[in-house]
Amino acid sequence: MIQTQTRLNVADNSGAREVMCIKVLGGSHRRYADIGDVIKVSIKDAVPRGKVKKGDVYNALVVRTRKGVRREDGSLIRFDSNAAVLLNNQLQPIGTRIFGPVTRELRGANFMKIISLAPEVL
C-alpha cells in the first residue's frame, strides 16, 4: 500500500536511490497504489552523474511492496521493501537494468519491457 509521502527504493539504474510518492495516479480521490500501479514521484536521493537528479519529478511503476500481492490460488507474495522503477512521460523505463525480482502481475498491465529486463519474475 503506497500512498502520498511514502518513500520507496528505486529498482533500476537510472541514478536515483530513493523516491517519495507525491500522487497516486488513476482517479481524483485514489489513496493507495499497489504492485503494477503508476505513481508520481519526486527524487529524494540520487547518485552523482546519474540520469536523474534530486528534486526531479517523474512517473514510477510500483514493482515491490511490503504488503504484497494475493494470487488466484490464495498464495501471497510479499517483499522486504517497497520499490519502484522510474518511467518517462511515455511510461517507458528510464533505466536500462532492473534490480531484484518483479511479479507476474506486471504482465497484464502492459509493462513487458520491465518484465524482460528483470532478472527474476515471481
Swiss-Prot record:
Biological process, per Gene Ontology: translation
Entry GO CC: cytosolic large ribosomal subunit
InterPro entries registered for this protein in UniProt: Ribosomal_uL14, Ribosomal_uL14_bac-type, Ribosomal_uL14_CS, Ribosomal_uL14_sf
GO molecular function, one term: structural constituent of ribosome
Assigned keywords, A-Z: Ribonucleoprotein, Ribosomal protein, RNA-binding, rRNA-binding
Similarity-based family: Belongs to the universal ribosomal protein uL14 family.
Described function: Binds to 23S rRNA. Forms part of two intersubunit bridges in the 70S ribosome.
PANTHER family in the record: 50S/60S RIBOSOMAL PROTEIN L14/L23, LARGE RIBOSOMAL SUBUNIT PROTEIN UL14M
HAMAP family, A to Z: Ribosomal_uL14 (MF_01367)
Complex formation: Part of the 50S ribosomal subunit. Forms a cluster with proteins L3 and L19. In the 70S ribosome, L14 and L19 interact and together make contacts with the 16S rRNA in bridges B5 and B8.
Protein name: Large ribosomal subunit protein uL14
Gene this protein is translated from: rplN
